[in-house]
């Protein structure tokens, strides 16, 4: 994964939402209980929050991801989701564009700088940006779905989500191109396209079929 991968998904997201109208903004996303307005608001707010992480880290400082923590984050999504489509689009465009400008400032020796997002560093923050933009672009339900996810992204996401595998299960995900395994215990093997298996593991609808009995997964880490 490189900055170019994040730039590509950011460009795709903004192109996908360029024609956003009121009906589209109020339509259902893939996420239960969330309209597209909710997803767009979350993406814009996340982009602003991550911009703060980057800018402060480059100055040698740490800052909270969201002022007020998770409750304030959730309240901001709900209050912002119902804005006019033009406002949603403007907020998203400005926030994502500003975030990408901040990422462009990061030099080769800056990536280990610490941030408070997941108590990690700028390199992990860039990966988080890749995940958030890629997954939620699919969540918008605007013609892009996990079938478009690259193999590199799928393998990264599977590894990030390893804590979702239940205890006492040896999970085997078998695709035509790769075998991914996690956990110890009773073998549970699922087969399908890598994108479908990854979508399921991420808690999203798989575009194609998966064979095998899917276990109940643990929460996101």
What does each model-found stretch correspond to?
Residues 14, 40, 51, 89, ...:
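Non-transmembrane alpha-helical segments in soluble domains
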Residues 1-5, 24-46, 75-88, 114-132, ...:
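Alpha-helical scaffold segments that form or flank carboxylate-/histidine-based iron centers
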Residues 2, 55-65, 105-221:
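Structured surface interface patches that mediate subunit assembly and partner/cofactor docking
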Residues 1, 48-98, 104, 217-221:
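Short, helix-capping/interhelical loops that line the mouth of catalytic, cofactor-
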Residues 9-12, 16, 46, 95-98, ...:
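Amphipathic, well-ordered alpha-helical segments in soluble domains
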Residues 4, 12, 16, 20-36, ...:
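Active-site-adjacent loops and short helices of periplasmic peptidoglycan-processing enzymes
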Residues 7, 11, 44, 48, ...:
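A structural signal for well-ordered alpha-helical segments within the folded catalytic domains
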Residues 19-25, 104-111:
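Surface-exposed helix-capping loop/turn segments at secondary-structure junctions
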